[in-house]
């Protein structure tokens, strides 16, 4: 009896046929055992995926329940922040402004001193209106 290639057999049917016929038996037995092993592995993987999804769902439900349990405390904290916001200290901007004023003041003083020293002292071109040495 020739084996028909167009018929798709399930792994169990293939194993049964392989045990029944001796001509194509070893090939069908091997393919049947491998097919059963593959089906088992696929079923195991599907079960593991289902368990993982179920565990993930349980973890998500537990996290949601915890969030709902903490909701009154969170609302109370939010209301307190809105009613009386915490006072923040503004030390850094004041410090930066003070340093900027000091640097500008120091720069102005240095500019003034350097400018005075760089100008030569020329005698005035007009005669003095008052005599420098009084007569006795």
From Swiss-Prot:
GO terms for biological process: cell division; cell wall biogenesis; protein localization; regulation of cell shape. Disruption phenotype: Deletion leads to defects in cell shape and polar peptidoglycan synthesis. It also compromises polar localization of Wag31. The chain crosses the membrane at residues 94-114. GO terms for cellular component: plasma membrane. The keyword Transmembrane applies. The keyword Coiled coil does not apply. It is a single-pass membrane protein. Keywords: Cell cycle, Cell division, Cell membrane, Cell shape, Membrane, Transmembrane, Transmembrane helix. It is found in: Cell membrane. InterPro entries: CwsA. It comes from the Bacteria. Required for regulated cell division, cell wall synthesis and the maintenance of cell shape. Belongs to the CwsA family. Interacts with CrgA and Wag31. This is Cell wall synthesis protein CwsA. It comes from Mycolicibacterium smegmatis (strain ATCC 700084 / mc(2)155). The gene is cwsA.
């Amino acid at each position: 009896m020739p084996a028909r290639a167009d018929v798709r057999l399930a792994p169990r049917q293939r194993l049964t046929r392989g045990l029944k016929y001796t001509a194509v038996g070893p090939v069908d037995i091997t393919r049947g055992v491998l097919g059963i092993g593959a089906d088992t592995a696929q079923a195991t993987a599907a079960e593991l995926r289902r368990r993982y999804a179920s565990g993930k769902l349980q973890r998500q439900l537990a996290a949601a329940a915890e969030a709902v349990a903490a909701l009154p405390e969170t609302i109370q904290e939010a209301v307190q922040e809105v009613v009386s916001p915490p006072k923040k200290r503004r030390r850094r901007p004041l410090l930066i402004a003070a340093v900027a004023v000091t640097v500008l003041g120091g720069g102005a003083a240095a500019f003034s001193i350097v400018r005075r020293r760089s100008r030569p002292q020329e005698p005035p071109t007009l005669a003095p209106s008052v005599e420098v040495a009084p007569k006795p």
